[in-house]
Amino acid sequence: MIVTDAWFPQTNGVVRTLAQTSEWLGRFGHEVRMLTPRDFRSIACPTYPEIRLSLLPRKLVEKSIEDFSPQALHIATEGPLGLAARRYCLRRRLRFTTSYHTQFPQYLRARFPIPIAFSYWALHRFHGAAVRCMVSTQSLRNELQARGFRNLAAWRRGVDTDLFKPGPKSYLSLPRPIAAYVGRVAVEKNVEAFLRMPWEGSKLVIGDGPERARLQALYPTATFTGYRYAEELAAHLAAADVMVFPSLTDTFGLVNLEAMACGVPVAAFPVNGPIDVIQDGVTGALDHDLGKAARRALTLDPKACRENAVRCGWDASAREFEGNLVACQSNQSSRGAWAMDAGQGAAAGVGS
């Protein structure tokens, strides 16, 4: 069972990661139950309407877990569903795993005057109860270990290279070179750094969010498309000349892999996430000057971007996730990697 507060119709890397993982686990022969806001009464998040917050989910979460009786339970998010599932597991002495997808301390700080230290304390308390907390990159792992997290395991991300692949540049008729941003248009994504950077050509914003109206009014020369999905998203991305990733707070940045799979180099700041995904001078350019990084990325070989991305399949990502799972009961008979107890964690990449 995978419990997540992030699910469709949200459009982000967390949802895409969990959807792909669930699909591949099914291909491996597992019966997967996703517990999502679609199963509950919910309200729109006041600051982000597309995010649904489940209302008073405790009893239904408990019933869902009892009815499904999972061999392994993974809590993917720290929202109402994740909190309810964690509470149930602790009360029933069930073992579980979690994953760290979002830098909530930085996200919250960008919106509200909440001390970062307090947010990390809350996250440490949440994830510390799990047998393993899965993280996507080594730099994130190092950062969390420095903040006292001790139960960390590696869970790399993947990309659908059949969907995201090189395509015709003629798909977009904007003046060249085209620099594209793909993702939520929100304050924590630092989109304005992309829109402010000097650029001779076109800027394309593929996505939507609470900051779109303000930024579209401030930067009328940029093209805002709103959300694009699946083949249409891949076609837009493949037609760009460079993808710019301005975020300073992402734990990974799945769109970086998607751009590389399309043969499009990525420009980003040298921060956690990009430094783990982008090979500077090969698949993209890292620089504290975002415009300089974007201009340098234009000189890179698209074939090298594609070649690096095809090594990152979702099948390998799902296998790594599977290997990190633990049996809910310490004496439970379980198959394959789920039989592994916490003492064998080094084999699954658990930090010390």
Per-segment meaning from a language model:
Residues 298-338:
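A charged, aromatic-enriched C-terminal amphipathic alpha-helix characteristic of glycosyltransferases
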